């Protein structure tokens, strides 16, 4: 295992996910810039490097820089995650993006690709040795091995790998976790499980029944976005959320955060991007 600096965040107690009867829609047009990273359709593999961190059968770190916390060890992530070097993490804008990775240069490598999600940052050390570096969970790293050879592959520590960007397919709808520090004048949300691009270029919010139109949220850190009331008055729920993916696709979850919302709870929408 290759050690590296880790981000330390407060790990919150897991709270229930609430399903709400909300509606939404997706618009498949490009808003602003188009992502320069291919989604893997019709493009070949690129060369990079891989290491692993955390326990041999673990999920890397539950204090990761994207903010997903203990969710990384649960479905749909299922510990198949990686901390991305700077070109992959992109100051948090790469959180939630999906990649296939395979290794062939070690006798323990199966040559079969595994799919991982970027959930953390690897900002220095070995993660700067290649243009793209994945510091994978022990589970994901071992999954590249031939049957029964996971420990042997992990003992190599550092691998040359091939990777490509692929669409995310989370098999559930987008969810929004309200940050524990939110209050009537400040709302911060963690965006999870966006299909397709996986990453987000922008997040907008609309207060109760269209009041004030769409307002741009600011990226707080990782996959968390925030809005402060600048009127001196409390923000007015229910809140609709509009997501713009890295390639410009727009998805709207109407009234997804209800009146009476509570900090620390997760609210699941009824919408997601096409995978």
Swiss-Prot record:
Domain Expansin-like EG45: 63-173
Keywords: Cell wall, Cell wall biogenesis/degradation, Disulfide bond, Glycoprotein, Membrane, Secreted, Signal
Domain of life: Eukaryota
Domain Expansin-like CBD: 185-269
Family statement: Belongs to the expansin family. Expansin B subfamily.
Alphabetical list of PANTHER family matching this protein: EXPANSIN-B3, EXPANSIN-B5
Protein name in the entry: Expansin-B5
Gene designation: EXPB5
């Amino acid at each position: 295992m290759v050690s590296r600096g880790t981000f330390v965040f407060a790990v919150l107690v897991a709270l229930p996910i609430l399903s709400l009867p909300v509606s939404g829609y997706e618009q498949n047009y490009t808003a602003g810039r188009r992502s320069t990273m291919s989604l893997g359709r019709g493009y070949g593999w690129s060369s990079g490097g891989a290491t692993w961190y955390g326990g041999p059968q673990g999920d890397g770190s539950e204090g990761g820089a994207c903010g997903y916390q203990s969710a990384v060890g649960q479905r749909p992530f299922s510990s198949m995650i990686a901390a991305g070097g700077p070109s992959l993490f992109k100051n948090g804008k790469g959180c939630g993006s999906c990649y296939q990775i395979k290794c062939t240069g070690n006798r323990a490598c199966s040559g079969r690709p595994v799919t991982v999600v970027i959930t953390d940052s690897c900002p220095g050390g070995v993660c700067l040795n290649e243009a793209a570096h994945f510091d994978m969970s022990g589970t994901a790293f071992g999954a590249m091995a031939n049957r029964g050879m996971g420990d042997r592959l992990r003992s190599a520590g550092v691998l040359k790998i091939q990777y490509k960007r692929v669409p995310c397919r989370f098999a559930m709808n987008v969810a929004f976790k309200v940050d524990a520090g939110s209050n009537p004048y400040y709302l911060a949300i963690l965006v999870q499980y966006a299909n397709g691009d996986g990453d987000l270029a922008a997040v907008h919010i609309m207060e109760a029944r269209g009041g004030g139109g769409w307002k741009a949220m600011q990226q707080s850190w990782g996959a968390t976005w925030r809005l402060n009331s600048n009127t001196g008055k409390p923000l007015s729920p229910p809140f609709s959320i509009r997501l713009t993916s890295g390639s410009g696709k727009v998805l709207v979850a109407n009234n997804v955060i209800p009146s009476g919302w509570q900090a620390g709870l997760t609210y699941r929408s009824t919408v997601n991007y096409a995978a």
